[in-house]
Amino acid sequence: MADAVDPVNKRRQFLKFLAASPLMASAGLTGGLVDELIASGPGGAPDLELFMNEVGKQEIAIASEAEALNVFDFQVVAKQVLPPAHYGYMATSIDDDSMLRINREGFDRFGLRMRRLVDIRSIDSSIELFGKHWSTPITIQPTSSNAAFHPDAEIAVARAARNKNHIQMLSTVASSAIEDVTAARGEPIWYQLYADSYWNRTLAMVKRAEATGTPVLVWTIDLLGGRNTETATRLQRIDDRNCSVCHEPTATSRYSRSVKPMGQNLPDPIGESLSRGLTWDFIARLKDATPMKLILKGVVTREDALLAV
């Protein structure tokens, strides 16, 4: 008759086997931590669930983009290779980064309703939007200052968007000029607008985008009152590099838009400063100024969505 199997002992042996692997060593699960996890269950029984949770928390840097399993694998590398201020600029959210966590938690609540026994040999994820056919509904959002992360900046993003036929939005504070990005994309892109405090300067940016054939203007409306980016500010403080070559410090902001392509050669301010006084009336002004389609970026309430229709 076979001896009875001791599940506690078998589980302990299994965890020790895992802990001895190179993967666990690179993740930092060695020595005393492993011993603690092995003896952490009730009555000294190893807690497998706790062990695997600890494994999942470890940040293991990938050696190449081919090793990435999801986009968050690149964040681990970014922490290691980017200057502190550059990493903080990309990783920061508002205040204590609570909105970043809230957004992630919100998306985690979404699920897919999978239908079974469907022929998946030919899947069509394409959409029609503003009269144009796109391969997927994926939109590359307007992250700014891409030269802080790659020398090709938004030009590289445009090439990727062209290869996959994705919509690309270009930020007002992009490192690359809209004319160059449009050429790299091979067709007009969408333009994300930060309205200037003066209408004549805003109009100049709108007309410049229009001249490249841009079909859609995306006005960001959730940044009119400024923002408090604590993570970015903290990491800027510990970055001791001389950043004056790329950034122009001002009295109110560390970085001025004037050093960005879309902020250069703007006309001198004329008339009243709009500053924080922009309201829904400004939408009509934009629509009257350009034939481009207008999207409002930053709407979060049902009431504002109804006003935007």
Region spans (language model):
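Glycine-rich active-site/cofactor-binding loop and its immediate structural neighborhood
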Residues: 135-171
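Alpha/beta enzyme core
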Residues: 206-309
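Glycine- and other small-residue-rich loops at beta-strand/loop junctions that grip anionic moieties
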Residues: 92, 146, 150, 170-171, ...
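An N-cap/entry alpha-helix motif that binds or orients negatively charged groups
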Residues: 44-131, 238-278
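Active-site-adjacent beta->alpha loops and helix N-cap segments on the catalytic face
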Residues: 170-185, 199-204, 226-233, 277-283
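N-terminal secretory signal peptides and thylakoid transit peptides that target proteins
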Residues: 2-22
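Hydrophobic faces of well-ordered beta-strands that scaffold small-molecule active sites
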Residues: 138-141, 168-170, 189-191, 217, ...
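Conserved, mostly hydrophobic/aromatic
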Residues: 83, 140, 161, 219, ...
